[in-house]
Each structure stands twice: as C-alpha cells, then as structure tokens.
Amino acid sequence: MIQPVISKSGYTYIYSSYINSILLSPSENEYVDIDMDKNAYEYYKQKDFFLRENNFFEKKIPNMEIEYDTSCIESELANLNQLLIEVTDECNLSCKYCSYGDLYSNQDERNRGKQEFNNVKILIDYLISLWKSYRNISFNNTINIGFFGGEPLVNMILIEKIINYLNAVKIKGITFVYNLTTNAILLPKYMNYLVENDVHLLISIDGSKQNNIYRVKKEGKDIVFANIKKLKDNHPNYFDSNVNFNSVLHDKNSVDQIYSYIKTNFDKTPYISELNRNGIAEDKKEEFNRMFHSKEDSIKQAVNCGSSYLKEIADDSHIVQLDIFMQSYFGNTYKTIPDLFFQDKDIKYFPTSTCVPFSKKIFLTVQGKILPCEKVGQQYPLGYVRDGKINLDSKEVKQLYLKLYTPIVDKCKKCLLWKNCEICVFYLPKDEEGQTVCPYYLGNEDVNRYFSTYIYALEKHPDLLDRIENEILID
C-alpha cells in the first residue's frame, strides 16, 4: 500500500507514481470505518474501486535508459543553444573561492594561457557544417556565444576576432548573440566596443567592500565600483538592457546584503549562486565548509529579520521550487509537443538530471578540451581541438555517459526524486572503495517529509497555484 502524505495542516494525500498524480483523501481506506455515513461509505468504496481499476496504488518503476543514440547527440550539436569559449585562463583577480583555485582539484592547471583563434575557428567551422545540415531543425534559432575565463577582457583581441568572424557568417534562421562574464576591472578600456557590438555583460561582484573580501585584486586598489558606475553613467540604455550581476554567497556576505547593495547602487536584481560543491580538494574540505553558506538558509534568515528587500526574491525563489515540484508530480505538464501523444509509461528517462550531451551548450577550454559545460570537471572531456583538427566522436561521447550512468541507474529507479532530481551525474562523489554514491537519494521512508513541505506551501498560499499554472514559465 502506498504511504499516505500528511501535510502540516493535517490533510491527507496519496501520491501515485503509476499515473503521476496526487489525490486528496480524508484518510486512506477511511470508507471501512463502521461509523461512517452510508452515502460517504458508498462514495469512498466506489472511489477506491475506480482507483484500483486504474492502477493508482501500483508502484511505478520508471523506464530508464542509459545509452544515448549517436544521432541524438549529433542533432543536439546541429541545434545548439550556446557556444561557450574560454578565451583565457589568466585572471587579474585571485578569488579565494574560484572554481579554478586552490579549493578545487578537478580542473587543469592555470598557466596564464590564452585561447588560440585557430582552435576556435576549427570548432566554429565544424558547427557551421552541422548548422547548415538537414539535422538543424530549429526555427529562428538564437545561438548565444559566451566568452569565459579567467577574465575574458584580458584577451580582448581574440574576442574581437571571434565576433568579426561570426558576424560574417550568414546562415538562414540563425542569429548570434554575444555574452561575456567579467569582473569589470578592464571595463573602461573596452566599454565602447562592447556597447557598439551589443555584448551582454554579467558582472561578478559580491556586494560591498567587506562582502568582496574573497575577491582579491593582485595589484592596485579596488576600482570595480567606479568602473561599473562609469558604464552606467556613460551608456544608461545599454546598462539597463545588457548588464546583469552575479554574486557568490559565502560566509562574508548574505543574500540580504548582496541584494540591498546591488539594488541600491545599480537598480538591478542579481543572480546569486552558492559556492561550487563539485570537485573540492580533499585537504580543503574544512575550509570550504567554513566558507559555504546555503542560499535557502540565507533567504530564510533575511525573511525572519524582516528585510524589506528580500520578500520579493524569497517569493520568487519559492515559486521556482514549487513550479519544479508541480511540473514533476502533478501529471499535467508536457515539455515537448510529442509528449502530448505518449502515455507517461511510454516515455524513457535518463538517470539524474544530467543534460543530454550538448542540449544546453558546448564549452571549449584553453587546453582545447570540449566539455558539456563550464561546470563539469575537466577530467571529463567529450572531445578535443588539437593540432589543427577536431576530435569529437559521438560514439565516444555515448560510451562516457554510459559508463557514468551504469553504477547509479538502479538507485535512481528507486529514488523518490527520480522525476525531480537536481544533481548532474558528473557531480556524483565516490566512496572510499571508488563506488559512485548519491548523497541526495530519498527512499519511501522520506515520502511524507518531502511531499508535505511543498503541499503545505500550496495549502497556505492557494493563489500561488493559480499564478504558477497561468503566469509562470520557467525553462
């Protein structure tokens, strides 16, 4: 029998994994109560019969695949959304928490290297051949070209060459948009070019001077604030439309402080991310744990303290989580048109929340490695650009993912979160014996705790249900 879920309000629900729906019930099997009204008894008896007839109480084991079709991988490349280029691994800051710094052990050594235009051109030309092929079925596709580092502006010459090269490429139905992540130290030197070429900026800053204590400048005084203000004053329209902020949460700031600082000084709502928990060096775990602060806890703290800034962002964060929950468990969400024509039992899933290779982006490192994204450790290359040629074999990509999925797939089938997983297979740690483990696994004993939290939020704020169903669109 399925374990009932009792919300904090005292209502009882039953979740059916078989048809992926949640049913409100006064109490599981309550119709057998001898003191129940006869009409109520008949109602629940018929309802129970109907549910059993439709396998509501059957436990569903998801149909999971662990092998990608090679044609699927090639199709994703032909319909690519983002090409991310590490233009240099050199940086004019030395941030304590940097994913390429001393806290981590899953990245290549940083040698102040610069990306070569020829390598980028080889990859672009390879992709162009796919974008022009029959595999490209996108309609009016916008491809984001991202410049990553290090500090990308250190190698501005390369950025200009890439933009000039792509601007000369004419492919029907494809438009290029340029994005750059920067610490803003070199911003005044290149701001006119960035404005003229409509480059979108993501500026990294953690708040006030005290909040930025981990963002160590190697030489000279802190000029970031002045540079950002200069951009805002000289190009206000560009600043409004093309500039956003990213802040890293740690033990020297808080969500409240970050939001307050950036909203007050630049009238922007920042993206706030936690410290990267993937690939921490064994001898740095204690230091990492001291620096790490949970975004969820920081938001709760701000709300509890009555922050005037945080109510909106806390609500939005809550809505995002509720939307993901509803998409996963309410049984009425269809992510693609073909999903409308298949029963859930016919849909094949893959373990974890790992993206299909190249479905989101492709990342080229200074070392010539091709990765599925910048967050994946560089011990997992999917291909290379070296010696004047590209080596990207869809069969080898398929085998790598198969190797990663195999040890975890049986665990995923039994996990409560199999439809709502948030971890990438590349992030899964190994135990002392080298076996892959998942720290987020939830078994049947956790069903009440997990479901009741979200259900209670919807009980308490029924308006959110309507807002999420009719107003919120999260991709």
Language-model features, listed with the residues they occupy:
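N-terminal [4Fe-4S]-dependent radical SAM core
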Residues: 2-24, 42-84, 102, 133-139
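Flexible mid-to-C-terminal extensions adjoining Fe-S/redox cofactors in radical SAM and related proteins
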Residues: 6-11, 352, 369, 375-475
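Short loop/turn microsegments at loop-to-beta-strand junctions
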Residues: 10, 357-360
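Short, acidic, Ser/Thr-enriched surface-loop or helix-capping motifs
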Residues: 17, 364-365
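Conserved alpha-helical substructure of the radical SAM core
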Residues: 69-192, 197
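Hydrophobic faces of well-ordered beta-strands that scaffold small-molecule active sites
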Residues: 83, 143-145, 178-180, 201-203, ...
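Conserved radical SAM core fold
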Residues: 104-105, 152-154, 184-188, 200-218, ...
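Radical SAM enzyme [4Fe-4S]-AdoMet core and its adjacent flexible, acidic
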Residues: 215-353, 357
